[in-house]
């Protein structure tokens, strides 16, 4: 049942509403039904489309999506074309400005370098280009000065025309003829002004065309001058080559004949005369090229210069230390090239090759020198042969895991290196290389310091244990050396001790040639050869240490047993005596005793 039916039922029940509905016309009833009509909600239809269209206006046309998209595309293309045209106009303006600047620079360079060229080459100076440039400047100045008075005349004429027109307007109220005259005068003045403007524009166009023609002529002259310079260069080179060949032939012939000192001098003088001319031409060419090369590409060249200078200076800096290392200089015990900017990998390899047979250098430091695996492999070869280097620093370089493993494999044949540093490399070593390092270090017993932070905990612990093991071995060796040195000193003392007087008397029965004035009665031997007195007895040995007390003194107080403490002697009770007797007795010794009545 719809809501309209319910409403009609209510209306039928209410007589007043029924009477009102009867009075309504059919059109009004339709409007009322439309207002009361409510569409049942449908879940598949969106909420915005469930309500009926309440607009009274009719649609002008059907919505066409393709037409709308085409219109948008056309509009965007038009906008893009406008932007492109604006950009092109800006680029053309910038290019014209740059060309004008280049032409001015070329003119200035020509003015400065034109007379020098002519004087050096021994030719007459070409003044045509200079005259043209001066005439051009004068024309430009004259054109500017001519344009200004013409423009001022036009402005004055326009002002006069305005004044006349105002006067004519005042007189127009009196006579109608004045108006016709004013109109005629205005037209005539406008025609004159337009004719003058067109004349000015024509003059400007003519001047521009003349400027273009002059620029073309100058370019042609430049091309011709460059061709002439190249031709003169080629001819000079040919002359040099031909002169050199002829000079060599003449000298050989004259040496064979044994004559020709004067001829050789003449040939040398001719060659010397030809050389300055060619040198001057080369200088002039270089001068003409320099102003043309001062373009945006110019600033890049100074940056290349210092780098080349540093590369060339690097070998000169490190030549002396390399020679000292090769010659085994005893004063050079360290080779430190840390943080050097101009050093290369080739120089580092040369250093390692020189250190291979060196027996003086003990420290080789090349931190932050951009060393790569090639240098690491060279160091590995050097460590196999060198037995004096004790410290090696390779921090902050470009060595990978392969180069580091090669160095550690070389340590298996090296027993002198005690410190190795290779921290902060560009490439990460990784877990595999760390495990390999730990395996290789197990067979090395001399490395004590390792400058590297292990990422994995396993290799880190094993390497720390191995380094502590090596430290203990070194300490034990040191103690053994100290003991051996002490024993050697004791043996030397025994050998150097002076023998006693009794032993001297036994071994030498002859009297000494220099008798002492006061002979001591103790040293005088008895007649009949009595035996010497026995040596004194050795001192008594120290009492043996009690091991329990020593253990208690070394162990902490918390771990000591209470029974170990020495307590004062106490008297035993009868109960204690009884218990002690029971513990010491056997079952055979015990007798059966009747149980007392109280306990039964």
Curated annotation (Swiss-Prot):
Tissue spec: Detected in lung vascular smooth muscle (at protein level). Detected in thyroid and extraocular smooth muscle, but not skeletal muscle. Detected in heart, aorta, skeletal muscle, colon, urinary bladder, uterus, stomach, and small intestine.
Region (8 X approximate tandem repeats), start-end ranges: 165-293
Record Pfam families: Tropomodulin, WH2
Residue windows of the Sequence repeats: 165-180, 181-196, 197-212, 213-228, 229-244, 245-260, 261-276, 277-293
SUPFAM superfamilies xref list: RNI-like
Principal location class: cytoplasm
Pro residues composition-biased segments: 510-522, 532-543
GO molecular function: actin binding; tropomyosin binding
Disordered, as annotated region: 38-61, 80-324, 472-573
Localization of this protein: Cytoplasm, Myofibril, Sarcomere; Cytoplasm, Cytoskeleton
Function: Required for proper contractility of visceral smooth muscle cells. Mediates nucleation of actin filaments.
PANTHER family per record: LEIOMODIN-1, TROPOMODULIN
Official protein name in the record: Leiomodin-1
Name of the gene encoding the protein in the UniProt record: LMOD1
């Amino acid at each position: 049942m719809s809501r309209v039916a319910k409403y009609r039922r209510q209306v039928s029940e209410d007589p007043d509403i029924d009477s009102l509905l009867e009075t309504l016309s059919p059109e009004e009833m339709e409007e009322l039904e439309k207002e009361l009509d409510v569409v049942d909600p449908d879940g598949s239809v969106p909420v915005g489309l469930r309500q009926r269209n309440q607009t009274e206006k009719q649609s002008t046309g059907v919505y066409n999506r393709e037409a709308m998209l085409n219109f948008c595309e056309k509009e965007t293309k038009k906008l893009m074309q406008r932007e492109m045209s604006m950009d092109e106009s800006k680029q053309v303006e910038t290019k014209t400005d740059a060309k004008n600047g280049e032409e001015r620079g070329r003119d200035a360079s020509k003015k400065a370098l034109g007379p020098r060229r002519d004087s050096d080459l021994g030719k007459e100076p070409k003044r045509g280009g200079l005259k043209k440039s001066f005439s051009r400047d004068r024309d430009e100045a004259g054109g500017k000065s001519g344009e200004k008075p013409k423009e001022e005349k036009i402005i004055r004429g326009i002002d006069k025309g305005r004044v006349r027109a105002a006067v004519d307007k005042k007189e127009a109220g009196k006579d109608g003829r004045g108006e016709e005259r004013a109109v005629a005068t205005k037209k005539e003045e406008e025609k004159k002004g337009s004719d003058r403007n067109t004349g000015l524009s024509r003059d400007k166009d003519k001047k521009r065309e003349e400027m273009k023609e002059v620029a073309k002529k100058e370019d042609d002259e430049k091309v011709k001058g460059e061709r002439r310079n190249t031709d003169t260069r080629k001819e000079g080179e040919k002359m040099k080559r031909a002169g050199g060949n002829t000079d060599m032939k003449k000298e050989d012939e004259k040496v064979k004949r044994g004559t020709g000192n004067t001829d050789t001098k003449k040939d040398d003088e001719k060659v010397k005369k030809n050389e300055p001319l060619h040198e001057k031409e080369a200088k002039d060419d270089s001068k003409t090229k320099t102003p043309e090369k001062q373009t945006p590409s110019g600033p890049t060249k100074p940056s290349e210069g210092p780098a080349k200078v540093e590369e060339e200076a690097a070998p000169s800096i490190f030549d002396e230390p390399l020679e000292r290392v090769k010659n085994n200089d005893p004063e050079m015990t360290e080779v430190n090239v840390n943080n050097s900017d101009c050093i290369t990998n080739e120089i580092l390899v040369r250093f390692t090759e020189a250190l291979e047979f060196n027996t003086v250098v003990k420290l080789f430091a090349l931190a932050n020198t951009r060393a790569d695996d090639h240098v690491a492999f060279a160091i590995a070869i050097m460590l196999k042969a060198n037995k004096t280097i004790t410290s090696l620093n390779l921090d902050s370089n470009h060595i990978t895991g392969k180069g580091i493993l090669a160095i550690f494999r070389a340590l298996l044949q090296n027993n002198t290196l005690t410190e190795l540093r290779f921290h902060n490399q560009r490439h990460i070593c990784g877990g595999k290389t760390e495990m390999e390092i730990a395996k290789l270090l197990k067979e090395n017993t001399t490395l004590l310091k390792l400058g590297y932070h292990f990422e994995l905990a396993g290799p880190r612990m094993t390497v720390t244990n191995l380094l502590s093991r090596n430290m203990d071995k070194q300490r034990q060796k040191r103690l053994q050396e100290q003991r051996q040195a002490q024993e050697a000193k004791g043996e030397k003392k025994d050998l150097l001790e002076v023998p006693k007087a009794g032993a001297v008397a036994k071994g030498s029965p002859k009297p000494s040639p220099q008798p002492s004035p006061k002979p001591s009665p103790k040293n005088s031997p008895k007649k009949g050869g009595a035996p010497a007195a026995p040596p004194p007895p050795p001192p008594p040995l120290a009492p043996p240490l009690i091991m329990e007390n020593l253990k208690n003194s070394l162990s902490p107080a918390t771990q000591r047993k209470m029974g170990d403490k020495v307590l004062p002697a106490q008297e035993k009770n009868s109960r204690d005596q009884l218990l002690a007797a029971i513990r010491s007795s056997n079952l055979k010794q015990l007798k059966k005793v009747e149980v007392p009545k109280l306990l039964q």
